[in-house]
Each structure stands twice: as C-alpha cells, then as structure tokens.
C-alpha cells in the first residue's frame, strides 16, 4: 500500500535504495512502486539478471545488487547500471550496500526492519535530502508513528 502510494507520486530521477535482511519485503515494496507507476504484470527480483526495466508512467529500473559486490565501475557500466540513474527514469535498488559508491547523492534510503513482537509487521525507515522532502514528507506523515 505505501509502495503503491509512493509510486503514484515518484518523480522522474528518483532513486530508492532499499536495505534489510532477507525476507523483509524489499521486493514486495518494489511491486507496490511498480503498481503505483502503472506497471501491469509481474515484478520479480532480478537476482540473476541484476537489472529489470519496466515501462509505466515513468521508466522503472529494478536493481538487485546482491550479486554485484566487488564489481568494478566498468563491469557495472556493461550491465547498464548507470543508465538506471538517468533523470528521465526512476530506480529501486535492493542490497544497495554492494554498489553504494555508484548511487546518486540524492538517493532516498529505505531500511526495512522486523518488528519483534509482530512478525508480520515491518518498520520502514526513510532517509532523504531536501530535494525529496517536498514530495515525500506529505506522503509519509500519515504513517509516522511517534
């Protein structure tokens, strides 16, 4: 639900970097973003293809960087990683810690964590700069838990 809402408002050039343990819902969040961007059809984690691009309201690159640890900049360029961060596209990166130096400075960081007493719940922590503040804060405020 939150992923879909953000996808409906995601501006061109936005990059979201999602980190969290296995099973925390990174791919489920990507599916919500894709729905919000008007992308029909299945969205799956591109674990072995590294990058999957979809067409919706805006082009959407879904990156799974889990297997990209230690790759050099030239190798990442060969698979089209830098193309995902063009201003006309949107991008969602799972396991961003493996390619952090290659992400744009204004990347929105999302951390997904388990909630100990509620195993089916997730805590979502967003970190973003002032560029994202104007469009993102009004969307997240109703979900803020004090």
For each feature predicted by the language model, list its residue ranges.
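Pre-Walker A adenine-sensing motif
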Residues: 1-9
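Conserved nucleotide-sensing/catalytic segment adjacent to the nucleotide-binding pocket
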Residues: 42-43, 53-95
């Amino acid at each position: 639900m939150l992923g879909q809402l953000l996808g409906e408002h995601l501006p061109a050039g936005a990059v979201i970097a999602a980190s969290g343990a296995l099973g925390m819902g990174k791919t489920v969040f990507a599916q919500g973003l894709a729905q919000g961007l008007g992308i029909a059809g299945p969205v799956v984690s591109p674990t072995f293809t590294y990058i999957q691009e979809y067409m919706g309201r805006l082009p959407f690159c879904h990156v799974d960087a889990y297997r990209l640890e230690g790759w050099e900049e030239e190798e990442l360029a060969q698979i089209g990683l830098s193309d995902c961060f063009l201003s006309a596209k949107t991008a969602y990166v799972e396991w961003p810690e493996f390619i952090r130096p290659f992400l744009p400075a204004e990347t929105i960081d999302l951390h997904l964590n388990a909630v100990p007493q509620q195993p089916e719940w997730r805590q979502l922590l967003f970190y973003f700069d002032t560029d994202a503040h104007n469009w993102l804060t009004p969307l997240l405020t109703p979900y803020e838990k004090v």
